[in-house]
Amino acid sequence: MKQLLDFIPLIIFFALYKFYDIYVATGALIAATTLQVIVTYAMYKKVEKMQLITFVMVALFGGMTLALHDDNFIKWKVTIVYVVFALGLTISQIMGKPAIKGMLGKELTLPDAVWSTINWAWVMFFSGCAALNLYVAYHLPLDVWVNFKVFGLLAATFVFTLLTGGYIYKHLPHEPKQKNQ
């Protein structure tokens, strides 16, 4: 249910962009993200840091997009969110407490070197997405950027999550196989 809530603002943004324009879609994104945070808090009595950062960035850059009638701000929001995530993971790594381990370490037992590798991999992923977003936003038409934001980045995140899962699985402690007697 929680994951479904994460996609609703994105779906609304995409649909309203296709039927109207970037400004209607941005206004709806701000409203949907605000509602998403409220519903998440009402249901779980907690809002994750990543969701809160995304909400603040949507409100700030979406608001600037609407106030100044300039779609560059909503384009920048995507890059800035990814840069903030990459910096957060980098700082956590430098401090010796990989954030990825903090998020998943209660459920998974892995060596510190594996957590470190996963953390750095996500730093690189978020940094790459930030750079790629800038390229698409400023070298391709707005329609292409919206599709990239909604489908391209979502697909890339899904694939990278699967790859991370495979890497984690490879390093999980496995029970020795018992021989049939």
Curated annotation (Swiss-Prot):
Lipid bilayer topology: Multi-pass membrane protein
Subcellular location: Cell inner membrane
Cysteine pairings via disulfide bonds: none
InterPro entries: YciB
Keywords: Cell inner membrane, Cell membrane, Membrane, Transmembrane, Transmembrane helix
Transmembrane segments: 10-30, 50-70, 80-100, 120-140, 148-168
Pfam family, one: IspA
A GO CC term assigned to this protein in UniProt: plasma membrane
Family: Belongs to the YciB family.
Function: Plays a role in cell envelope biogenesis, maintenance of cell envelope integrity and membrane homeostasis.
NCBIfam families: ispZ, PRK00259.1-2, PRK00259.1-3
Name of this protein: Inner membrane-spanning protein YciB
Protein species of origin: Vibrio cholerae serotype O1 (strain ATCC 39541 / Classical Ogawa 395 / O395)
